[in-house]
Amino acid sequence: MHLVGGAPPEHPEPARPKPASRVAMLSMHTSPLEQPGTGDAGGMNVYVIELARQLAALGTEVEVFTRAVSSRLPPALEIAPGVIVRHVPAGPFEDIGREELPAWLCAFTADVLRTEAGHAAGWFDVVHSHYWLSGQVGLSAARRWGVPLVHTAHTLARVKNASLADGDRPEPEPRVQGEQEIIKAATRLIASTDTERRHLTQLYGAAPGKVDVVAPGVDLDVFRPGDPRAARKRVGLDPDTQLLLFVGRIQPLKAPDVLLAAAAELIHRDPDRRGQLAVVVVGGPSGSGLERPDSLVKLAAELGITDIVRFQPPVPQEQLAHWYRAATAVVVPSHSESFGLVAVEAQACGTPVVAASVGGLRTAVAHGTSGVLVHGWEPADYADALERILTEERWRRHLSTGARLRAASFGWTATAKGVLASYQAAISPAAVAV
């Protein structure tokens, strides 16, 4: 820095690294273009596509590499100015389970490297990998291109294995080892919450100084408050219905069965409530094309609540916002969540959330202000929290107001700026190379 009218300093400041102008974003196992709530598509899909769009809006071009699941997909598709999704042929042109994908890592990596070879030298400034499979690809790509690797885990095997639900399979040891390798070698790590940061440092030995906490965002233009009665009519419900809503993939980890059991408990306590209550599950089974998960259909029958339970296939975000606005409460009883995007989307619509007190849900939901956090998975405890919301209008309005205020701080612009800061730290000469 030079002072006007004076001599230059004896020891000039080092030049600042140039901003990241192009980023290779890796999302091997799930395309950001897939409908969340189907197969393995979920909050990470929303994260990748919204982050890419916002980064481009701030001046950073993004190329997202994802596995091609159909021969009809174009090799490259520009989905927004500055955002290209590249469909990489690796394995069969169909959805396959995540447990089968490690066999196709080499093929995916080779095609990513081949694509970059068609660009000018030094095309990408940063590699940003999402989930451990992409992290393995990112290690190779970053080393080949001589650029830093920034990694976002989204979920961690050791955390999931410590909180398995009944019927869940533990994550395999190769995943644990793969995550360990990525966390050690990555230039920067992005965690969604302070809790995830602690998991990275305490369970995987990540250097605290290279972990950046950047909360995911929510589209506050799409997910916004509205008239609940009008929203209920729009989704085909009576305006006076008290709606309990679950949104997400149907799998033991997400515990939708807890909501069904809690609803049955509410009716047991007050049989007259049956005519007012509705339970809607918006989502599809993980890794299956079934429209309705058989296990939940059977559970509803066993609990005697088939008449009040409705299964809704996954819907686009604009339609999902109507469901959130229609709900009296959104229930998120997951056994593990690195953040809990559904909880924030619901709160942005002014809907109170009843969630498990685990992981990132402790950050997403302000207990007693925007919703209620429940310890454990006893249906009666969820019924207690829901009963108060259903019966005490003043309490429900208090939580609704708090929900809107809570969600207001989770915009995608803030997320993108935080991620850009992590990129800059990775590019800095002081950063540790991959």
UniProtKB/Swiss-Prot annotation:
BP-aspect Gene Ontology terms: mycothiol biosynthetic process
Gene3D superfamilies the UniProt entry points to: Glycogen Phosphorylase B (3.40.50.2000)
Residue sites binding UDP-N-acetyl-alpha-D-glucosamine per the record: 35-36, 43, 249, 254, 315, 337, 345
GO molecular function: acetylglucosaminyltransferase activity; D-inositol-3-phosphate glycosyltransferase activity; magnesium ion binding
UniProt key word Chaperone: no
Alphabetized Pfam families for the sequence: Glyco_trans_4_4, Glycos_transf_1
EC number(s) given by UniProt: 2.4.1.250
Domain of life: Bacteria
Keywords: Glycosyltransferase, Magnesium, Metal-binding, Transferase
Region (Disordered): 1-21
Catalytic activity, reaction form: 1D-myo-inositol 3-phosphate + UDP-N-acetyl-alpha-D-glucosamine = 1D-myo-inositol 2-acetamido-2-deoxy-alpha-D-glucopyranoside 3-phosphate + UDP + H(+)
CDD domains, per database record: GT4_sucrose_synthase
Binding residues for Mg(2+): 324-325, 327, 351
HAMAP family reported for this sequence: MshA (MF_01695)
Family under the similarity heading: Belongs to the glycosyltransferase group 1 family. MshA subfamily.
NCBIfam families xref list: mycothiol_MshA (TIGR03449)
Job of this protein: Catalyzes the transfer of a N-acetyl-glucosamine moiety to 1D-myo-inositol 3-phosphate to produce 1D-myo-inositol 2-acetamido-2-deoxy-glucopyranoside 3-phosphate in the mycothiol biosynthesis pathway.
Entry protein name: D-inositol 3-phosphate glycosyltransferase
